[in-house]
Amino acid sequence: MKGVFNLQMKNSTSHRQTLLIEIANAITHGVGAALAIAGLVILIVRAVHTGSPMRIVTFSIYGAALVLFFLASTLFHSLIFTRARRVFQILDHDMIYLVIAASYTPYCLVAIKGWQGWTLFGIIWAMATAGIIYKSIWFQKKGKWSTIFYVIMGWMCVLAFWPLWHALGPVGFGMLLAGGITYTLGALLYSMPTR
């Protein structure tokens, strides 16, 4: 009897910890969504001041994708104990592909431009579309392949090394590189097995 009681206590404590973690996740991702909305407004205002329609469109795509990314994650963590969990978990993972492609959009169409920018833009959005379809249909299967695909998409910018270097300069390119390294480390940590 004592063993059953200990198991029930352990399960109750584990459930409470999971609930607290999911509440914290929902709150932090909700704050991220609010900050992304503020960032979207700032990006649009700055783009409008440049008078460039391409900047307005590309900055809006990036900002809107970031809002959707955090919103999907907030909804997933908020509804984790409901039947809607699976749908929002798939959307949460799909939004990773969307935000990667949207992150490339200003670089491709404002910084690189021309045929190289449009080509990389097409490749990245095709990869994002394929990733979203794959993740939506085969969500539970081969999760490590999704992480590998995320990282490959993230490093596709090496195809446009010189145009990016010339457009961004050493400081801008260094920041892009630092972001890529940080993202890759995050993907590696995410892909590590948990207990």
Language-model features, listed with the residues they occupy:
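Multi-pass alpha-helical transmembrane bundles in non-GPCR membrane proteins
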Residues: 2-195
